[in-house]
Curated annotation (Swiss-Prot):
Catalytic activity: RNA(n) + a ribonucleoside 5'-triphosphate = RNA(n+1) + diphosphate
Name of the encoding gene: ORF1
Keyword Signal: no
CDD domains: bZIP (cd14686)
Organism: Ovine astrovirus 1 (OAstV-1)
Protein name: Non-structural polyprotein 1A
Family that this chain belongs to: Belongs to the astroviridae polyprotein 1A family.
Chain coiled-coil ranges: 109-143
Active site: H452, D481, S544
UniProt PTM: Cleaved by the viral and host proteases. The protease is probably autocatalytically cleaved.
Xref: InterPro entries: Astro_1A, Peptidase_S1_PA, Peptidase_S1_PA_chymotrypsin
Disordered as annotated region, ranges: 687-708, 822-844
EC number: 3.4.21.-
Amino acid sequence: MNVYDKVLQFGSKKARARGMALNKLSRNRLEDIYAGSGPLVFGFGPIDMVDPGSLNPSIKTLDTVYVAAVQPDNQYVVHHFVPGRNEWVETDASTHQPTALVGVLVQDHKAKTREVEDLKSQLSQLRMEHEILRHEYERLKLKSPIVKPFKPLKVLLFSLLLGLLFAGVTNGARTGTCYAYDEEKDTCLYWEWKDSREVAWYDSYVTEALAIYNRACVYVRSKEFMTYLSLVFQTVFNWYFCATALAVYYMARAENPIVMFVTLALATLSQFQLLAVAVLPLLDFSATMGLWLSMVVFYMSQQISILVSFCVLVLSVMIGTFMADSEYAMMIKGHAVVFAIVCYSHVAMILNIPPWVVSLTMVCYRLWRVCFVFPAERLEIRSADGKVLHTVPTHPNWTAKVTRFVQSLRKGLRTSVAPTARIVPDGIAIVEAREGVGTCFRVKNNLVTSKHVVGSDDAVKIRWGAQEDMARVTYRHPTKDIALMALPTNLQTMPAYKFAKAITDGPIVMTAFDEANLLLVAVTEGVRVEDHMTYSVATRNGMSGAPITTVDGRVIAVHQTNTGFTGGAVIFVPEDIPEVRKISKREQELEDRVKQLEGMLNMDQAYVDSNLIVDLVREAVQREMKVLRTELANLGGFSQKKKGKNKSTKRKRKAVWTEEEYKAMLEKGFTRDQLRIMADAIRDQYYDDEDEQSEEEAGYPDWSDPGDSTDIENEWFGYEQSWKELEPAKSGVVVNTLPKDLVFKYSLDNYPISKQDIQAVAKELKIYEKAISDIISTSVSTDGKWKDDVDAQKILQELDGLWWGINHTLWEHGLMPFTQRRKRVQQPKNSKGALKTRAPKSAN
């Protein structure tokens, strides 16, 4: 019934075994009566029953099985089994102290367990509310401004860059006249400077702006309009203005702007200007280094710079062959861009193309790509079967990576590590269904996954390593996102997960496959909220149905949600797996027969009220009984005393068999106790020994109308056959049977065999008859004696085994064994014969 009852097993073991056998025949089961109770105690006790075999009602005391336990409401309840009714009935009996004490403790333990579960649920709810409030507090809390530390190196580099940029727009040249010159010393003795002033860097811009303004005011449609427009472009796309703005931006926002400062400085010296900045998103590390090298060489010699960039491109083509296709293509693309801008810059220098035209060209190219091409940010590298191997960004932008790398170094060090966890790498498999792909794992003889993975499919494909097979979906949980599948034959060696004893907040482990079929293991903190588990972990497609385990490898939940970084799972406990009860062949036949009868009943168009039929039968029986009473009352002298009741002496018990018959039966293997029981049974068929001293009037008992239809149904249909569940037991003692009586004892010729027997076990009966015939013919001579080379005990043991086997086969098919059937009566060989089927004559 429960674990306490299995361990303690109070009461008599014999009574327990008998009670379990009777429980199979009972209309109400002990599992339902004592559901949720403590340990049971079994014992034998008396019960008063009305003897149905006598004409006069009499009370007969029988021994039956008593069962007692403490119910969930702490009530000590006792039931006993009532034969005939085949039902457990509540009764009053003495209290078994150990059972009562343990039962009360069990119920108290269950109450405390429920209380603890409620407290855990409340604690989880409070923790979740605390996390929400803490998040809201952090959101509403006023953040203090972050003061960045003063870095002299950054300021120095920024000052040098500004000085380099402003040096290109300043005019520091001064002219004059030498009036006295010393040829020996090659020096000017008297120099007169001309009146000149240093041109400020903004004078040209102011002059140009005023000129544009004046000319626009005079006449906007003049021929010089295009000149004005070119001046505007020169102002907007001026390299020094753009470089200054970019340097200020990186100075304020970037943690490490040195890389950008170096690029801007080299672009200013080499006159690459905006070209160098515009192509940075297309360059990886090697291409960025090639750009720096080309700009340095370009400052010294343009022709050599073109040669150097081309050599670097060829070298990258040759050396990069060991790299992956995506990385190789990205590197070649970057070096090709470097070679192209070096050539473009050289052509611009030769043709005296203004710098603003080059800048405008790059801006137009980038605008065209953004507005019309719509380039993707990432490229997915897939295999031949469509699996995503990895993703590659279309713009490597190595300079941005360097900035992020430096920022990552500024993060605080971890003060703790994740706990060591036990994983089962071969314990999960991939589920492929029409709705998508997921993960599954084995628990007992079931494969478990999420219900939304299998969808409405009846069968899905399971891939476990190199093995593939189809699995049938056997169960979908009504309230949880859990589905069970039958374990295929090819996956019998798959490791199985075990359930955790308790599910609490703490470290959890998720083992799953991602969409690229890579094994991922994550250890994080999980929080239980009612029937769900929440945790923060990077989740991907294909992880649905993955097992969520403790650090000991015990399963506690099934992963179901995927929001990118936060995950969720549904709690998985043993109660979520339905209990599978094995249906016997007899029960299956009865179910099929019931369905057949229900179908026939549904096809019948004529509906007959069952209550009307019962009333008609009751009226007919009552009318017939009245007629019989009248006829019996009109018969004279019908009432008489029983024979043998008018004598004061007790009737003598006569022998049932003759001496020869008695000895012959002893030789056949029957014991004296067995013959005595058989003789008493034969005498009981002809004599009434209950009231030998009393004189009663023979006749029918008084008739009384039944109270309701229930009494009639119990009287007519309230009996069941109890032989079905009584399994034949194999005897351990071999009876010494004479060889000439083997055929009579083991042959089936003396037993009635029905049509149902032949339909069910015809093959087994034929095999049994042939085996019996072969054994007897090879071990018994024609004169009815054992052969010389035969071991009689071994032959008898073999015959007993065959006899027990055929009876057990009948019992398995729901048929009455031969041990419970009556043999056909044979005429005895003596002249007197057996006891006649009438009472012996009186001695008087």
